[in-house]
Regions:
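A short helix->loop->beta-strand "cap" motif at the edges of active sites that frequently abuts
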Residues: 99-105, 120-122, 276, 299, ...
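Flexible, low-complexity linker and terminal segments
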Residues: 217-218, 224-238, 377, 382-633
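Flexible, glycine/charged-enriched surface loops at secondary-structure junctions
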Residues: 4-6, 51, 165-167, 178-186, ...
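Active-site cofactor/cluster-binding pocket
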Residues: 2-238, 242-244
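Thiamine diphosphate
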Residues: 14-99, 242-245, 249-355, 364-385, ...
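Short gly/pro/ser/thr-enriched loop/turn and capping motifs at secondary-structure boundaries
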Residues: 55-58, 112-115, 132, 252, ...
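Gly-rich Lys/Arg/Thr-decorated short loops/hinges at beta-loop-alpha junctions or inter-strand turns
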Residues: 17, 133, 174, 197-220, ...
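Short beta-strand segments
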Residues: 86, 106-108, 128, 305, ...
Length: 633
């Protein structure tokens, strides 16, 4: 196949709505180049959703970077690839197979393309990346690294992108290492000029910023941020001064980001010393133990982990639940069980988190769907943990945690104050005439009054224990006292329904007997799937769950529909099971839409599953009273 002409297959023509996928070898420096491409699209004012699909080894295995450009602002995976940049021979068969008919493959034409890789229904664009690098560079490492920058430059030409934007980003990226600016600029220029000379108008995919094609982008004020960074900032603004952790993919960057920003935002202005502490513990058990100890002492503390760490922490979570000690646990979910796929995403810790530990335990869970919500919910988590005196578990995942995503700027109210809940201070204890009871339900809401150690020289001191006790924290094995305590804890969990974020409900454009429930990272593809199905005449109301325990609106939503599709990324339909277990609803009404191969679910997969489920269904639509709405995608 010629390296100077694209094949004449049918062409996909699209403006501001397509998917580019880079296929690379892990450890070759491709991530920085691919991010440069995504950042340039974003800088041009277009919604972009990049995601890094990487292996769990350090070097040598296939890695991918998928970039979705969507004028409508869809952030989830669409499914399919319109343009593939194939520079990894090891995965090329699979990579080419993913390309949509009429799509494009950019490949290294230094060697002739194997006939077995050629499809008559797609367009091939050969650029001799290796040959160019051999000609321009003598250092082997430079040849490896600059090949990536060369293909980014070529894409800038093929897609009619503003080349100045790429140059600006390179200059910004290497402003502290100016010697690297010139060679990177040269590599960009090499790729751009080659593609411009040999492939004018060869690709029907275009990016147009502003004007009639994207008029709503003129006031583009969003940011690119990953969920883990947003969580770290939420912890700082939420008042956290202590973190204990054990490194575990994909949660590690939460504490790394917390440390980086705390060094700027949590410094005593008078002494210049840190107003925070971080401990890398010997294991996950030690980490959660330190968090519970710090929280008991009045500090706002957290840990970050993933599924395997959550399993190890479960006994300590039971202690915090039963002894009623605040704590925040960040769970960045990955594919399990056991080691599973450490660098792939799932939502498969739901049940283990909700009921973590032995005995009758129930934990409050939060389900953020965006980077902005990661920030907001983390701040809320610290308030909730102290108001409810219980662990709060943030249920993020690798897709949200480790990938940059389009987000509105994070918002913070400088007048906001920490909500520490029911705390008795020294003055309160001094004025009390009755005996202080740590576990007395004074307000009949299940939430008792706590004290901080050292609040009073002679009043309010108790032994915090994981064994049974009475209302005054005195050890007892009396069955009646135990039952009273357990029933109060259940009452507190019911009270939590009035504290946690409510679900977001969006009504369809007309009456329908179908509903859809999603949460976390299934939300964006879920909303997109609903729009696709509506164009086909299939209407669905939606509910985005944001917290557990579920409030009455969840029961009402299911009751108002004949069928409700529950979209989640795990094998066993864990959210569906949790809904059935905790709510008064008929199991047959809830239909699972499941996806668990480790990649984020796509709108296409959701649409296909729902089409199949309702193919022969002709139930008459019922009237509903859907009040809340959510417009974000």
């Amino acid at each position: 196949m010629s390296s100077t002409a694209a094949t004449a297959a049918r062409r996909i023509e699209a403006v501001n709505d397509f998917v580019v996928k880079f296929a690379n070898v892990n450890g070759t420096g491709s991530a920085s180049a691919n991010h440069l491409f995504a950042k340039a699209i974003f800088r041009m004012g277009l919604p972009v959703a990049p995601r890094n699909i990487f292996p769990s080894n350090i070097q040598g295995a296939p890695t991918w970077y998928e970039v979705r450009i969507s004028q409508k602002g869809y952030l989830g995976r669409r499914g399919g690839v319109d343009l593939a940049v194939c520079v990894n021979a090891q995965s090329m068969v699979k990579d080419i197979a993913e390309v949509e008919p009429g799509g494009y493959v950019v490949y290294d034409s230094t060697k002739t393309l194997d006939l077995r890789l050629q499809r008559p229904d797609i367009n091939y664009i050969g650029i001799p990346f290796t040959q160019i690098c051999l000609r321009e560079y003598t250092d082997p490492r430079q040849r490896l690294l600059f090949k990536n920058i060369i293909y980014v430059g070529a894409l800038a030409s093929l897609l009619n992108l503003d080349f100045n934007v790429f140059q600006e980003i390179v200059a910004e990226t290497f402003k502290s290492k100016e010697r690297l600016i010139s060679p990177n600029m040269q590599a960009l220029e090499l790729g751009y000029q080659y593609a411009a000379k040999h492939y004018e108008n060869a690709v029907g995919l275009q990016v147009v910023s502003g004007g009639e094609e994207a008029p709503h982008m003129k006031e583009f004020d969003h940011i690119l941020m990953d969920g883990n960074t947003a969580i770290a900032l939420g912890a700082i603004y939420g008042g956290a001064t202590f973190a204990a952790w054990y490194p575990l993919t994909p949660s590690t960057s939460v504490v790394e980001a917390y440390e980086m920003y705390a060094k700027r935002l949590r410094i005593d202005p008078g002494t210049g010393k840190n107003n925070f502490a971080i401990v890398q513990a010997e294991d996950e058990l030690a980490a959660i133990g330190m968090v519970i100890g710090a929280s008991w002492n009045g500090c706002r503390a957290f840990t970050a982990t993933s599924g395997p760490g959550l399993s190890l922490m479960s006994e300590f979570l039971g202690l915090a639940y039963y002894a009623e000690v605040p704590a925040v646990l960040i769970d960045i979910q990955r594919a399990g069980p056991s080691t599973g796929m450490p660098t792939r995403t799932q939502q498969s810790d739901i049940l283990s988190a909700a009921y973590a530990s032995h005995g009758d335990t129930k934990h409050v869970l939060l389900f953020p769907a965006t980077a902005a919500e990661c920030f907001d919910m983390t701040v809320d988590a610290f308030d909730l943990s102290e108001q409810l005196q219980t662990p709060i578990i943030m249920m993020s995942d690798l897709e949200l945690g480790m990938n940059d995503a389009l987000s509105p700027p994070l918002k913070w109210d400088d007048d906001r104050r920490l909500k520490r809940g029911k705390v008795l201070h020294g003055k309160d204890l001094e004025e009390m005439k009755e005996r202080y009871g740590r576990y007395l339900d004074v307000d009949d809401d299940g939430i008792t009054y706590r004290t901080f150690p050292g609040s009073h020289p002679s009043k309010g001191a108790i032994v915090t224990r994981g064994t049974s006790r009475d209302e005054y924290a005195v050890y007892t094995e009396d069955g009646d006292a135990y039952v009273r305590n357990m029933e109060r804890l259940l009452k507190k969990f019911e009270t939590a329904k009035t504290y946690v974020p409510e679900p977001k409900i969006k009504a369809a454009s007309g009456d329908t007997n179908y509903g859809m429930i999603f949460f976390g990272t299934t939300a964006s593809p879920g909303y997109e799937a609903v729009e696709i199905l509506e164009e086909e005449g299939i209407l669905l109301d939606t509910m985005r769950l944001r917290a557990f325990p579920f409030n009455a609106e969840v029961d009402q939503f299911v009751d108002e529909h004949e069928l409700v599709f529950v979209v989640e990324q795990n094998r066993d339909g864990q959210m569906r099971r949790l809904l059935i277990n905790e709510c008064e609803m008929l199991p047959k009404k809830l239909v699972s839409v499941l996806h668990f191969d480790g990649l984020p679910i796509s709108a296409r997969a959701i649409v296909s599953s729902i089409r199949e489920s309702i193919g022969g269904d002709n139930v008459t639509p019922i009237k509903k009273n859907i009040k809340r709405s959510e417009t974000s995608k």
